[in-house]
């Protein structure tokens, strides 16, 4: 029923907003590029017959009324902001597919018991202020006050950026939804991995979203001359760091479900001919089960301490962030499964290793996600790509999922 060509044209048009010479997209929160994106999507929402407004957090919302004005609302959406030099599907697909769903309903005279709201959440990525999911946290009523003091590379705080965008940070609590007012939240998103591609399927149903911990390691040794210091006398924190990173890989692999990554490492003083004095790196550890993730972390910590003693270096750790795993709602999963069956797609289940706005909304409503196949599993890159056909398939599954949720009492 949905018009895949219309969805695709909108994706491509939106992808021009913030486009870089590399072909990637940079569209940070509370910038002129984000404003242009919001205005463009707002025009799509109005074309779809929605009542359009922004809440106190800057979340862009388009509402389709239901037959019962007192019924709880079904939310569908994602985000419009990007990472630096990212792709044009991560976030926008979920928002524009939501618009396509309600526009198709309106064009075919489909009415629902529950109202439906399409939401484009503010600052999911956190690329500008290094604190993400601002809009969804605000809607859930869980945005900590200290987040307003986070600053970008230019020294501008989140509070200042909101004011520059015409928002009042003091009104942020007004964005919070009251308990019991949201029936469910459904998000269509690119997978950002290779599982669907490996299985040859265009869409999949998400079982849950992995919980993560970020742990900063600081390893201190002794800076000495690289040529004049015998190997037997060295207190080399870089060698210890390398050994610990291998331990992380080994312990994560033992479970079959945990993933551990070190994507950031700093070496001091950083001379070619100097044994480092200090090495810092951050561990990203994720699993769908918190107890499994925590067991892996304990094993890593014990082995890291052993390595420190063997190499005569000092290891300290600091937990930077923790996010609990979130399981998707049985009701939303059943609706998505029925949608797949209706459309002739297998019900393929997979977890999400990446965090999404869904995580923040889980405390206030049932949540669910549908994934669309990612070419080569690439995301957060100009090479991010999903085909027109796969995007349309995901939107069709989303349509029938939302319809079923919005029809029920």
Curated annotation (Swiss-Prot):
Residues at the site labelled Necessary for dimerization: 234
Cofactor(s) demanded: Mn(2+); Ni(2+); Co(2+); Fe(2+)
Binding site for a divalent metal cation 2: 90, 125, 380
The organism's taxonomic lineage, starting at the top: Bacteria, Bacillati, Bacillota, Bacilli, Bacillales
Known EC number: 3.5.1.87
Binding site residues for an N-carbamoyl-L-alpha-amino acid: 192, 225, 273, 286, 355
Identification of the protein by name: N-carbamoyl-L-amino acid amidohydrolase
Gene: amaB
Assembly notes: Homodimer.
Textual note on the cofactor: Requires divalent metal cations for activity. Binds 2 divalent metal cations per subunit.
Keywords: Cobalt, Hydrolase, Iron, Manganese, Metal-binding, Nickel
Chain positions covered by the region annotation Involved in dimerization: 208-325
Residues bound to a divalent metal cation 1: 79, 90, 189
Signal peptide positions (record): none
Domain of life: Bacteria
């Amino acid at each position: 029923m949905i018009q895949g060509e219309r969805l695709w044209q909108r994706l491509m048009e939106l992808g021009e907003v913030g486009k870089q010479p590399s072909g990637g997209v940079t569209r940070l929160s509370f910038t002129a590029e984000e404003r242009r994106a919001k205005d463009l999507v707002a025009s799509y929402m109005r074309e779809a017959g929605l009542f359009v407004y922004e809440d106190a957090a800057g979340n862009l919302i388009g509402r389709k009324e239901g037959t019962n004005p007192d019924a709880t609302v079904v939310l569908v959406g994602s985000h419009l902001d990007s990472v630096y030099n990212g792709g044009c599907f991560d976030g926008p697909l979920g928002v524009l597919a939501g618009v396509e769903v309600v526009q198709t309903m309106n064009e075919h005279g489909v009415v629902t018991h529950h109202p439906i709201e399409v939401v484009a959440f503010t600052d999911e990525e956190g690329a500008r202020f290094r604190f993400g999911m601002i809009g969804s946290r605000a809607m859930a009523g869980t945005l900590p006050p200290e987040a307003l003091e986070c600053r970008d590379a230019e020294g501008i705080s989140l509070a200042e950026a909101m004011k520059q965008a015409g928002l009042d940070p003091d009104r942020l609590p007004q964005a919070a939804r009251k308990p019991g007012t949201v029936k469910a939240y459904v998000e269509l998103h690119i997978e950002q991995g290779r599982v669907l591609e490996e299985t040859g399927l265009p869409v999949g149903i998400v079982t849950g979203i992995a919980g993560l911990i970020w742990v900063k390691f600081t390893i201190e040794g002794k800076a000495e001359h690289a040529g004049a210091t015998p190997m037997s006398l060295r207190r080399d924190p870089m060698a210890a760091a390398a050994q610990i990173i291998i331990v992380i890989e080994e312990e994560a692999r033992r479970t079959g479900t945990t993933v551990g990554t070190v994507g950031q490492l700093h070496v001091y003083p950083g001379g070619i001919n100097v044994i480092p004095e200090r090495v810092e790196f951050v561990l990203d550890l994720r699993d769908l089960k918190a107890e499994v993730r925590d067991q892996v972390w304990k094993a890593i910590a014990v082995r890291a301490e052993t390595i420190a003693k063997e190499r005569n270096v000092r290891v300290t750790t600091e937990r930077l962030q923790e996010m609990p795993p979130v399981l998707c709602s049985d009701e939303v999963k059943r609706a998505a499964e029925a949608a797949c069956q209706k459309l002739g797609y297998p019900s393929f289940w997979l977890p999400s290793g990446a965090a999404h706005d869904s995580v923040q909304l889980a405390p206030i409503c049932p949540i669910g996600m549908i994934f669309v196949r990612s070419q080569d599993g690439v995301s957060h890159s100009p090479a991010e790509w999903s085909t027109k056909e796969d995007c349309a398939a995901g939107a069709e599954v989303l349509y029938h999922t939302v319809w079923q949720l919005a029809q029920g009492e």
